[in-house]
Every structure is written in C-alpha cells, then in structure tokens.
C-alpha cells in the first residue's frame, strides 16, 4: 500500500467529547468518526485493524470446528417473546415496527435466532454436537454511550453457540471454546486474564470472562498470584476472615454518637478500628399474589470497611428482584433515618442476613435504631439470635484465596470476551429438542461464546499507548511496517532503494505501507507514531552513502542502523518475534 493511495486523516487535538485515552487516540489517528451518540463510522485505518481482529478470530473458530453462518440484525419479536427477553431486556433492546405493524428487535445478541435454527434443523443425536458462529453488527440502546468503542450503541461481536446432547458434551464444547479464546488473545499479543464470572441476564450457569489488563479498566479482577484462581469481583468468593468467633468481653452498651452517621466517623469517635463496626443495608422485595402486593424488608449486615456485592445479594433465597429501600420505608420499619440502623429492636420484623465475616465478629458496634446512638459490645447469641449467613461482600486485596494457596490480589481489566454454559435455559423455553437413540425427545444443552470485536480495539489501546500515540501489537496493527523515505520525490537514490525494499517486503508477505505523501520528516514520523505502526524504516541519502537504513520499533527509544542488504531479513526476524 502506498500512502498516497490510501486515506490518512490525523488530528493534533482530540475532540472535546473524547474522555478516555483509546477514544482520543482513535479519533486523532483517523480510525473512527462519530456520526451519532455511540455510533461511529470505521474509517479505512480503523477498519484494517477490525479486519485483522476478525481474521484471527475466524481462523481459531474454524480450527475449533465451529461453523460460520450469518444471522440477521433485525429479528422477529415472536422469537424474543418465546424466551421472555422481549420484556426482560427493557429499554436497551431497540424495538421497531415494519409497515405492516409487525414488531422486530434490532439484535444485541442472537440466542433466540440460533436456537430457532437448531430446533428446525437438528432432529437426531447423530447431528450433535454442533457449533455455529457469526461475526455481526449489534445494537444496544445504552442509556449513556461513552468512551468511544468501549461502550457504544452499535458494535461488532463474534458470537458462537454450541449444541450438545448432555452436560458432559456441553462441558467438552465449553473447554474447546475456552481454549480457542486463549489462543485468540495470545495471538492478539495482549496481556489478558480469564476469570470466573456470573452469568447475569443471559441465563444458565457457569461462565468465564476474558479481560484485557489495563489500569483504566472498569472491572476489578481478583486473582491469586500463587495459583490459577481468578474471578471477577461479582463472582469472587469472600471467605470468613476468622475461623471461629471469640467469646464476648464487653457488655451491650447504648452509646451516644451525636451526628456520627457513618461507620468511619463512629469508629473515629469511639477510637475503635473500622473493622469493629457493622453497617446496615436495607433492601425491599415486593411480591404480587392474586393481585395483592406484599412488601418484605431485608436487613443485610456487613463489616464497616466492606462493600455489598449486589450480585451475591441477589442470590439469597427469596430476595430476587430486590431494590434498595427508600428513606420513607426505612423510617417505617426502623423508626429512624439511615445512619443509625441496626438489627436490635427494629420497629417491624425484618429478614436478617449477615455476611460471613460479620457472623464471626464479637464485641462489635452497630446502630441502635435511634438518632445519635449506637450499640457497642454487641455479640451474637447473647444480644442477637443467630442469623442467616451468606457471602455477600466484595473481596479486598489480602483476603485469603478460596483455593487455600495464598492471598488475593486485584487488578483492573476491560471485558472483551465471555463464555457461558447456558444449559437448557433457551432450549427449554423454545422447545429445542433432539431424538436420542431410543427415539425419545431430549432438550439440547447449549453454550454461548462472545468476543467484542470492535471493543478489542479500544482495550488494546488502553493497554498499549504512550504520549506519542498508539502502540499496536504487530498482529493487530493496521500495517506491520511503514517505510519513511527522506526526499522520496527529490532523490532518485532514495526512491529507487525505497521502491526496491517495498517490493521485497510485499513479496515476503509483509503488510507494509510506503509513505510517499511528501510530508516533512517530523510530520511524517508524528503521524505514524500516532497511528501506532509497530515497525518503521527510514531511508535517506545520508544513510545510503554508508549502505545503511534506520530501523525503529514503536517502543524503541532510538533507531538502529541496519545494512541495506540485511534489512529484509532483519524485519522478518522482528515480525517473527
């Protein structure tokens, strides 16, 4: 490719609405162009990166014996109504009507359509297992699109769906896809971590997320440096911080804490460690039976320095669909405003749940259900009946690892892939069955596996950039090598040697671009450093007189002189690494 025949459009400054590094650099490098909230045109430079991401994914999916198809962007409402997701998805699901008044969804995911394909095409156990995948545009009507390709409304994903006879088959298919994902992300040249995760709204049980490691990542990844244990914050198990509860040493005492409504302030006033305080979180669950709505109030207790894990809380039996109680509801049940709540002497009965760590505490401090007062010296069994105990908190750095092999560490990551064991969550609601060896219908076991194709671009940049611009891993770069001739239009020697090297690199299969635009050296170098091409070769009269060219990797502090006749092999060796 010659730069004069390609479209290159760079900016010195990022648009004012670009918030994070990847968004700013992609806009400045001319890779994307915003045309609406969360909607972008992929410009030629950016599209080249997308195509390289897709090519790696497609090759590894094919190697894993997944079969490519292409499902529609616009999908009939009836399919989504079968699974109930037409209503469950809420406003994020874009709904449209055609001229006949028929309703359709602009798909954010394709479980319904692929299940419909399988239930009509797969009849016998002999046709299983099978795995279909596609790479398709999606649309999710995000409430607040931001961060460029990291959280847009229109985006591209690879979705694969496996179908098996039984759970054992599903687990095998799941492992095959998990291994394929590891190969894909290794080929991308990115630092990543696979972590155990919660299935969330998509349903089923058993899943892993794949995260690109980045300090700017939205997600907290929990792992043990001494083992293979890794989970996202939602799924990471928080073990009790003591093996047994100590005996009481203090009497229950109602203590004045004027104006101290936060655990931190109470601990400071009483000259106690924050870890000796307990915070109260009030949740409300409304249930309807025969047209009558009843309300249940739940009181969850956490250590003062811990945070509620809302995903874990939702798994407490009977609490599904909870919301945080309003101040009016809190006063109705506790006769006191937030800040002084506790489990002793509530105005109305509540369902009490305590975190594992709280269950092992003694002589702790909690609200007294009276403004400006807390109880000290609170102990289970004596002052309070034993309560339901669940793991309901976020882990913190230094917690014991659930596998017993050390303590936990936390790093930030950007989710770019997710694999799920769906089981029969969709085949049951859509009646997707096969006939077994005895001619009896059996529900198909299903798995689904997604990679955010366009999100990979943003995540890769968040991990790989400097003050000059993007630093693409070679496998993802729009071009592997850029040739920067000094005076290409003025020096016959420079032009001849540049053209010769360009043709040799092309013949060797190197993805090379020759910058023949006639730009000044400073501007030319700045463009390619911003765009992030990983390998640069400079050809100039001065070097040619000595029979040398200059090579500089995008991460290199200085250029390396290389003999003219050795440059092709030198570059090939760099690319091989």
Swiss-Prot record:
Domain of life of the source: Bacteria
Gene Ontology CC entries for this record: cytosol
One GO molecular-function entry: proline-tRNA ligase activity
One of the GO biological process terms: prolyl-tRNA aminoacylation
Intracellular or extracellular location(s): Cytoplasm
Name of a matching Pfam family: tRNA-synt_2b
Listed EC numbers: 6.1.1.15
InterPro entries, per the entry: aa-tRNA-synt_IIb (IPR002314), aa-tRNA-synth_II (IPR006195), aa-tRNA-synth_II/BPL/LPL (IPR045864), Anticodon-bd (IPR004154), Anticodon-bd_dom_sf (IPR036621), Pro-tRNA-ligase_IIa (IPR002316), Pro-tRNA-synth_IIa_bac-type (IPR004500), Pro-tRNA-Synthase_IIa_type1 (IPR023717)
Catalysed reactions, semicolon-separated: tRNA(Pro) + L-proline + ATP = L-prolyl-tRNA(Pro) + AMP + diphosphate
Keywords from the UniProt entry: Aminoacyl-tRNA synthetase, ATP-binding, Cytoplasm, Ligase, Nucleotide-binding, Protein biosynthesis
Family: Belongs to the class-II aminoacyl-tRNA synthetase family. ProS type 1 subfamily.
Quaternary assembly: Homodimer.
Domain notes from UniProt: Consists of three domains: the N-terminal catalytic domain, the editing domain and the C-terminal anticodon-binding domain.
Purpose: Catalyzes the attachment of proline to tRNA(Pro) in a two-step reaction: proline is first activated by ATP to form Pro-AMP and then transferred to the acceptor end of tRNA(Pro). As ProRS can inadvertently accommodate and process non-cognate amino acids such as alanine and cysteine, to avoid such errors it has two additional distinct editing activities against alanine. One activity is designated as 'pretransfer' editing and involves the tRNA(Pro)-independent hydrolysis of activated Ala-AMP.
The protein, known as: Proline--tRNA ligase
Organism in which the protein naturally occurs: Janthinobacterium sp. (strain Marseille) (Minibacterium massiliensis)
Gene name in the database record: proS
């Amino acid at each position: 490719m010659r730069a004069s025949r390609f479209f290159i459009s760079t900016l010195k400054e990022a648009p004012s609405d670009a918030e994070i590094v990847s968004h700013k650099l992609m806009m400045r490098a001319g890779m994307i162009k915003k045309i609406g909230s969360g909607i972008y045109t992929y410009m030629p430079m950016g599209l080249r990166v997308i195509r390289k991401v897709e090519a790696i994914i497609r090759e590894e999916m094919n190697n894993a014996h997944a079969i490519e198809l292409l499902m529609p962007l616009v999908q009939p409402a009836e399919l989504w109504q079968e699974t109930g997701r037409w209503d469950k998805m809420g406003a994020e699901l874009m709904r449209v009507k055609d001229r006949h008044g028929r309703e359709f969804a602009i798909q954010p995911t394709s479980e319904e359509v692929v299940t419909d394909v399988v239930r009509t095409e797969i009849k016998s156990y002999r046709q299983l297992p099978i795995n279909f995948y596609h790479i398709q545009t999606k649309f999710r009507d995000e409430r607040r699109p931001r961060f460029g390709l990291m959280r847009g409304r229109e985006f591209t994903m690879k979705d694969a769906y496996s179908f098996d006879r039984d759970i054992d088959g599903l687990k095998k298919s799941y492992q095959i896809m998990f291994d394929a994902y590891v190969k894909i992300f290794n080929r991308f040249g990115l630092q990543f971590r696979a972590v155990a995760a919660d299935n969330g709204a998509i349903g089923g049980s058993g899943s892993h997320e794949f995260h690109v490691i980045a300090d700017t990542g939205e997600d907290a990844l929990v792992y043990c440096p001494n083992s293979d244990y890794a989970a996202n914050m939602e799924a990471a198990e928080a073990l009790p911080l003591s093996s047994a509860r100590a005996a009481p040493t203090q009497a229950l005492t109602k203590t004045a804490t004027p104006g101290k409504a936060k655990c931190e302030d109470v601990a400071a006033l009483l000259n106690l460690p924050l870890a000796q305080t307990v915070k109260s979180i009030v949740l409300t669950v409304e249930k309807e039976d025969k047209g009558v709505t009843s309300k249940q109030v739940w009181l969850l207790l956490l250590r003062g320095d811990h945070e509620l894990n809302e995903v874990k809380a939702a798994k407490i039996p009977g609490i599904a669909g909870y919301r945080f109680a309003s101040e009016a509801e809190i006063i109705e049940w506790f006769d006191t405003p937030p800040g002084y709540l506790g489990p002793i002497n509530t105005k109305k009965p509540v369902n009490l749940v305590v975190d594992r760590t709280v269950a092992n505490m003694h002589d702790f401090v909690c609200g007294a259900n009276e403004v400006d007062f807390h109880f000290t010296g609170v102990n289970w069994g004596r002052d309070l009946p034993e309560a339901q105990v669940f793991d309901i908190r976020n882990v913190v750095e230094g917690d014991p690892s659930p596998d017993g092999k050390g303590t936990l560490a936390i790093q930030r990551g950007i989710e770019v892939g997710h694999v799920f064991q769906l089981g029969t969550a969709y085949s049951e609601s859509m009646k997707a069955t096969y006939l077994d060896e005895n001619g009896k219908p059996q529900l198909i076991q299903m798995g689904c596996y997604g990679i955010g194709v366009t999100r990979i671009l943003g995540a890769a940049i968040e991990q790989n950039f400097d003050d000059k611009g993007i630093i693409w891993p070679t496998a993802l770069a729009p071009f592997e090598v850029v040739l920067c001739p000094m005076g290409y239009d003025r020096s016959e020697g420079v032009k001849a040697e540049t053209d010769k090297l360009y043709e040799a690199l092309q013949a060797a299969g190197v993805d090379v671009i020759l910058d023949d635009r006639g730009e000044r050296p400073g501007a030319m170098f700045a463009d390619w450093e911003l765009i992030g091409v990983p390998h640069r070769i400079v050809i100039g009269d001065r070097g040619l007189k000595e029979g040398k060219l200059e090579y500089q990797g995008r991460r290199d502090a200085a250029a390396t002189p290389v003999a003219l006749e050795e440059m092709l092999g030198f570059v090939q060796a760099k690319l091989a690494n």
